[in-house]
Amino acid sequence: METQKNWQTLWRGGLMIFGMLMICKAKEDLWVTVYYGVPVWKDAKTTLFCASDAKAYSTEKHNVWATHACVPTDPSPQEMNLPNVTENFNMWKNDMVDQMQEDIISVWDESLKPCVKITPLCVTLNCSNITSNSNTTSNSSVSSPDIMTNCSFNITTEIRNKRKQEYALFYRQDVVPIDSNNKNYILINCNTSVIKQACPKVSFQPIPIHYCAPAGFAILKCNDKNFNGTGSCKNVSTVQCTHGIKPVVSTQLLLNGSIAEGDIIIRSENISDNAKNIIVQLNKTVEIVCYRPNNNTRKGIHMGPGQVLYATGEIIGNIRETHCNISERDWSNTLRRVATKLREHFNKTINFTSPSGGDIEIVTHSFNCGGEFLYCNTSKLFNSSWDKNSIEATNDTSXATITIPCKIKQIVRMWQRTGQAIYAPPIAGNITCTSNITGLLLTRDGGNRGNGSENGTETFRPTGGNMKDNWRSELYKYKVVEIEPLGVAPTKAKRRVVEREKRAVGIGAVFLGFLGTAGSTMGAASITLTVQVRQLLSGIVQQQSNLLKAIEAQQHLLKLTVWGIKQLQARVLAVERYLKDQQLLGIWGCSGKLICTTNVPWNASWSNKSYEDIWENMTWIQWEREINNYTGIIYSLIEEAQNQQENNEKDLLALDKWTNLWNWFNISNWLWYIKIFIMIIGGLIGLRIIFAVLAIVNRVRQGYSPLSFQTLIPNPTEADRPGGIEEGGGEQGRTRSIRLVNGFLALAWDDLRNLCLFSYHRLRDFVLIAARTVGTLGLRGWEILKYLVNLVWYWGQELKNSAISLLNTTAIAVAEGTDRIIEIAQRAFRAILHIPRRIRQGLERALL
């Protein structure tokens, strides 16, 4: 009895475990699915190519900054906003800045390669002061006869063994004395640098250059009006190319750049660190007009075969100082707004002053004006102090003009690099150039920050020299990202069959078009995959077409410039990216598919989010960051599963001829069937002949003469049966005999008939046995199924009875407990009610 109870308990526990397993199994399995064309990207460094309209700016002169290797700009550039997307930018760690710096230096060097070296001019110069050849005076500017000097020197002519004496006018900043009497001079930097003369037809006019991303990459743009260059940006868009950036090389003041759309923006890598430069972007331009009033003439000095040095021959009129004019009202109001912004960071008096020292490129505002390199003293511009009261004062309405003096240098050391310098040939005639100040480069003095340096005053000085800051002021809102069109996510679909691919369609992800769904959920974005991946190959082909046009325009040069090399690199990179994605899709068995299911089960350890949460609440970018650490593992599992499927497919194809019985009746197989039939018949006939010959030989050896093949041999009856009957002499009608056939066809037919009868009987016996076995198994299975149903019903009844019994027991226990509680409460209540009676009874006894 005890054993029976244990057995029932064991059955109940097993049934409960079985039920829980069934409930757990009822949850649908998830499988890895590959999506191609998802809007996902990551930060990247890649080779950008350029676009510009160089022909529209200069048709004759060779421009230093842009060449015809740049593709033409897009007349209708596309910009696609990315709603619900927040992206981090960092202008101080932007590879686009470093790339532009290298490109501009490379273009500058390449432009000077064919130019003449002026090393033969590194000789002793005998210099003296010059005087004007005109007796007239002018009050338009300050007369400065000492800004230039007349130098004579000996130089080699076209015939190398002959020398002659020449003279030329040089700026005093370009020569240094070599003795104490200040008569003998030498060109500056001659002992330390290789000086090249800029080609006489070179133009330094900055042409806007657009940086573009190759196919497979994208440029993200931050459109927040008050974006300071670092941190997150909520208004993000994607563009094919940047805006036109003029490569203006200047210090202290940023010229001809872009202005802020909102208020003035202060940008610094660390505003509290005085070692970090500050880039100020203005929201309103300030015009600066520069003049070189001297009417110079240019002369050519032959230094040898094919080498001509261009120098200043003479100056017509008074020698007047080069200068620049700025509106005092505009500049004062600009500094007031800049000081207001700086006080938001420091809350002290803002003092602007001149640089403390350094190279001439740093302590002055250096830039190129009409081909001449000017170095202007900005002490009049940065000489003011702004406290709370002066900032709140009324705007300056004065119409005065600030004039800052400038100097010209012809020997220029570009990019602050030692060993290289250029000689800028003089420009004939008067020079006037107008520029717009769009930004400032400042540095802050250090000191005691307890009460603020200089009694609560922060001092700011103009700076420069690092051209990367110039490019940062334009590239602060851009970043390059690499498109990751391959995505994996869990779905309820599983790859069921293995099919051979019939065709592969070339598709890919373009760097602009499909990113519009980046802010949508994964479910919404996966619906538009076809639209998202349509333009990659067309983008690559268009890029190749632009490159061929650029090379065709420059084919006479016989070698590529920096921009041409970048075009080739961008083209190769785009093709490599496309082939890499297609290779992965091919390895996974997903060629030509936008959505490709696999038989790899989804592992919950890769992401603990639910299926609905993934597809309804997350974007593809968020999902990619969620599983970024497991992407390599998932890829390897998909590859292993595909390899296994290919092996299975190979084994299946090995049995391909058995998959279709109609192939057996193919006319191409008839000759093979006839050959097999003839071989079988021939074998049977051969065996029959051999056995017949052996039988005859055996009987001849026994002395027996064989009967004719037409004789019927009676079949001998059994020994215990009579040979006849009454009246008829025995029953002869039932006697059987063996017929010996005569002829080849009869013999073959008899053997084939016997073979078919034998096969039929054996096949019939096999079918009967199989049918009997299947019937037995079916009966047994039906009995087992009924037994299982009865068992489940029995245990269900047991569970029901147990539950009812438990409920009854609980109800009885609760009822009994409730009755006891009620009884106790009644007794307590009656005791309270009987208290007066007990008191009365006690008093009565006491009185008695």
Swiss-Prot record:
Residues 625-659 form a coiled coil. Belongs to the HIV-1 env protein family. Residues 444-465 are annotated as: Disordered. Residues 127-150 are annotated as: V1. Residues 451-463 are annotated as: V5. Residues 654-675 are annotated as: MPER. It comes from Human immunodeficiency virus type 1 group M subtype J (isolate SE9280). A lipid is attached at C756 (S-palmitoyl cysteine). Residues 504-524 are annotated as: Fusion peptide. It holds the Pfam family GP41. Inhibitors targeting HIV-1 viral envelope proteins are used as antiretroviral drugs. Attachment of virions to the cell surface via non-specific interactions and CD4 binding can be blocked by inhibitors that include cyanovirin-N, cyclotriazadisulfonamide analogs, PRO 2000, TNX 355 and PRO 542. In addition, BMS 806 can block CD4-induced conformational changes. Env interactions with the coreceptor molecules can be targeted by CCR5 antagonists including SCH-D, maraviroc (UK 427857) and aplaviroc (GW 873140), and the CXCR4 antagonist AMD 070. HIV-1 lineages are divided in three main groups, M (for Major), O (for Outlier), and N (for New, or Non-M, Non-O). The vast majority of strains found worldwide belong to the group M. Group O seems to be endemic to and largely confined to Cameroon and neighboring countries in West Central Africa, where these viruses represent a small minority of HIV-1 strains. The group N is represented by a limited number of isolates from Cameroonian persons. The group M is further subdivided in 9 clades or subtypes (A to D, F to H, J and K). Residues 566-584 are annotated as: Immunosuppression. GO terms for molecular function: structural molecule activity. This is Envelope glycoprotein gp160.
